[in-house]
Amino acid sequence: MNTVVGRRIINGRRRPRRQTRRAQRPQPVVVVQTSRATQRRPRRRRRGNNRTGRTVPTRGAGSSETFVFSKDNLAGSSSGAITFGPSLSDCPAFSNGMLKAYHEYKISMVILEFVSEASSQNSGSIAYELDPHCKLNSLSSTINKFGITKPGKRAFTASYINGTEWHDVAEDQFRILYKGNGSSSIAGSFRITIKCQFHNPKYVDEEPGPSPGPSPSPQPTPQKKYRFIVYTGVPVTRIMAQSTDDAISLYDMPSQRFRYIEDENMNWTNLDSRWYSQNSLKAIPMIIVPVPQGEWTVEISMEGYQPTSSTTDPNKDKQDGLIAYNDDLSEGWNVGIYNNVEITNNKADNTLKYGHPDMELNGCHFNQGQCLERDGDLTCHIKTTGDNASFFVVGPAVQKQSKYNYAVSYGAWTDRMMEIGMIAIALDEQGSSGSVKTERPKRVGHSMAVSTWETIKLPEKGNSEGYETSQRQDSKTPPTASGGSDTLDVEEGGLPLPVEEEIPDFVGDNPWSDLSTKNSQEEEAMSSESGLRPQLKPPGLPKPQPIRTIRNFDPTPDLVEAWRPDVNPGYSKADVAAATIIAGGSIKDGRSMIDKRNKAVLDGRKSWGSSLASSLTGGTLKASAKSEKLAKLTTSERARYERIKRQQGSTRASEFLESLLAGEDPDSRF
C-alpha cells in the first residue's frame, strides 16, 4: 500500500516549519532624574511569559541644563563683576533653583554676548576679563574688549572656566569682570548663556504654598486723652503784730487749701507749704505742687498782695492793713525741683508796684521804697522721672521789719491772718512737646523787676522743715517761744548787743538766713469750719546749735540806719524814687542814686570814732552824742520819737528829743 504524503505548497514554495521564538534577554535601562516637576510617569511594561525577574541596574543620577539670562542697562562707564555659582543673583533659576537640588555642579561652557544699544556717534568700549578662581576684585587687564557701538560675542569652554572638576554647590566656580571707558549713557547689555551639569541629587522641601492673603486692617488706635489740670488758691499764714512801729513775728506755714480742676470737674485739695528760708529780717514762702506722671507744659500766674485781717469777732476776716514788700530785684516768684521731676524752658517775669509817697495807711507812709504788689508770670516744661513727682513755687520774701508793717495798731500783740497772694497753676499735657513763652504786656502801673531763666534749688533739709530763728526787733517786741516767732536780746534803752556775739551757722547763700531749723509737729488744716485756727507748737527748750564767733562787723545799710539813726544822709529811698519819677529817669538811675545813699550810710560809721584813734569801750563801739541822748529815753518815748521822724521828718524828731531832755511837755506841739 502506497502512502502519499502531501506537502502544502504556498505560492510555489514549501511552507516553512513553525519555529519557536527565542526569548530575548532584556537590555538594561538607565533611569535619569530631572528637576521637571511635571514629568509624566513612564508607563509600566507588561511582564512577558519568558521575562526574567531580574532587577534593572541604574547608575548615579545627574542632569544637564542650559540657562540664559541678561544684565541690562549697562552704561558706557559701568564696571563690576559677574560671579558664577551660588552668588549668581542675576539668574535665580540657577542659584536658588537647581543648585539647591544637588550636591555638586560644574559649568562646562559660558557664552558672553554684548548687545549694543548705543548710537553710532558714541565712542568707547567695555573691557572684560575672566577670573577662573574668583581671586580678583577689579579689572586688571583690558586686552579683551567689546566696542559699545556694535555687538560682540565670546565663548569660554570648560578648561578656561575651571569647569573640568565638580564643585560644591556652596562655592563659586569663576568670575567675569568688566569695566567701560565711555560716557554715562546706556551702552547696551550682556546676554549670557551657561551650560551646567549637576551631580548627586538631594532631598528638597516642596515648594511652599501660596502666601496667605493680606491680614485685616487693624483697628484704629484710640486717640490719647490729654489731661488739663488747674490748681488755684490764695495761700495764707498766721502772723503776730502789735503796732506799726514794731516788727512782726511769723508762725509756721500751714497746709494750703487749693481748688483742683481736671476735665471740668472741681474739688478741693490741700498743698503742703513751708518757709523756703527765713532769717531775722524776712522769710520766703514755698508751696509744693504734686505732678501726675507724664510731660507737662506749666503756666503759672501769681499776684502777690499781703493784706492782714483779724482772727476774732466781731471783725473776723476783715482787712485791717497789709505787709508791704521790698524792691529787691533778686527776689521774686519762681519754681524749683522738689522730687522726681525735670524742669526745662523756664521763663519767669516779675513786676512790682510802688506805693505813692503821699499815700497813708494806718498813719504810715510809703516813702522808703515799699511795694504794694509783686506779681509774676511763669512758664516751663516739666517731665516726671518717678513716683510722687512734685515741684515747688516760691514767692517774694515776707518782710518782718517795722518799715513794712502797715497793720492796724491795737497796743497789744495780736494774731492776724496774712494772705500771700493769688496763685493759679495750669498743667497742660497736650502741649508737652515744649513750653513756648507768650510775651505778655506788663500790668498798668507796674515796673518790670526782673526776668529769669534759672530755677530755684531745693532748700537744705533744715530749710524745708521749719525754723526757730533769732531776729532783732524793736524794743516793744515780746519774746515768744513757739510758732516760729523771732526774738533778740537788746541792752537797756534799745541799743544792740556788742559786735562780738555767738550766732548759729547759716545755711544757704544769704548769711542772715537759715539760722536753725525745726520741723513742725502738726500741719494745720485749712477749711471754713476750722476758722483758720492753727495749733501752736508746745513750748520747749531749743535744741543746742553749733555756734561760731563773728569778729568782722559788716552790716547792711538798712541795719546800720536802724541801729544808728544819726547816720541818715538827709534823704530817704522814697525821696530818691520821687525825684527819679519827677525827672523822668529810669529805674537804673534810681538804683544808682540809692547805691550812693547806701554808701553814705555806711560811711557814716566813721563818725562813731576817729579813724586814727578809734577805740572799743566795753566791747561796743563808742556811741555818738545823739545816740547817748536817745539811750536816755524810755521805751514809749523812743517809739514816739521814731514815729515823728518817719511821719514829720528828722528835724521835727530832733526838736521833740531836745524838748524831752529839757523837761518840757511836748504834747502841745507834737
UniProtKB/Swiss-Prot annotation:
> Which regions are flagged for Basic residues bias?
10-24, 38-49
According to the record, the residues making up region (Readthrough domain (RTD)) are 204-670
**Compositional bias annotation for Polar residues:** 466-485
Compositionally biased intervals (Pro residues): 209-221, 536-545
| MF (Gene Ontology) | structural molecule activity
Q: Where is the composition biased (Low complexity)?
A: 25-36, 50-60, 609-624
Note down the stretches annotated as region Disordered. Answer: 1-64, 203-223, 431-553, 609-629, 641-670
One GO cellular component term of this record is: host cell periplasmic space
Highest taxon, organism lineage: Viruses
Q: Does the keyword Aminoacyl-tRNA synthetase apply?
A: no
* Pfam families, per database record: Luteo_coat, PLRV_ORF5
Family membership: Belongs to the luteoviruses readthrough protein family.
Protein name (Swiss-Prot/TrEMBL): Readthrough protein P3-RTD
Species in which this protein is naturally found: Turnip yellows virus (isolate FL-1) (TuYV)
